[in-house]
Amino acid sequence: MKKILSILTVLCICGISAFAQNTAPKENIMKDKKVLVAFFSRTGENYNVGNISKGNTHIIAEMIAGETNGKLFQIEPVKPYPDEYRACVDIAKTEKENKARPAVKEDIAAEDYDVIFLGYPNWWGDMPMAVYTFIEKHDWNGKTVIPFCTHEGSELSGTERLLEQAC
């Protein structure tokens, strides 16, 4: 029994030290680049945790912007999606089936940036249609586009290839 407790103690100490924060200074690989972090995110009712005021993609976008000193830009449709989860899902499905391009509220001169992080939730195995609206407004030649996607287990679902085709 003592041997097992000793082994468990060592494993716990090793596990804790594995999570210790690295205090070495970070090299900013984006220091000479102008970075945009554009994202679409959903708030409102979430069937797992109730109502949320900030979506997962928004949270990740803020983290990326903080690490890269990038400009944060939220892609927002003119007509907001309903807060109620099922209603939002139904609208998103219809938009995808119709290849809709919902109008977005604002725009940003993406052409002025060298690196664009583009974030979106995976909706029906695709990007939300408002993201396509944003993509199709800009010239992506010579830009480095880095997608990031939030999902509930369906991974990127090939959206990185769709993004490559769209850009």
Residue ranges and their predicted role:
Residues 21-115, 125, 132:
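N-terminal beta1-alpha1-beta2 submodule of the flavodoxin-like/Rossmannoid cofactor-binding fold
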Residues 12, 42-45, 122, 152:
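Short, glycine/serine-rich, charged loops/turns that create anion-binding
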Residues 110, 136-142, 165-167:
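Short, conserved loop/helix-junction motifs that constitute active-site signature segments
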Residues 127-131, 158-159:
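Residues at alpha-helix caps and immediate loop-helix transition turns in enzyme cores, especially N-
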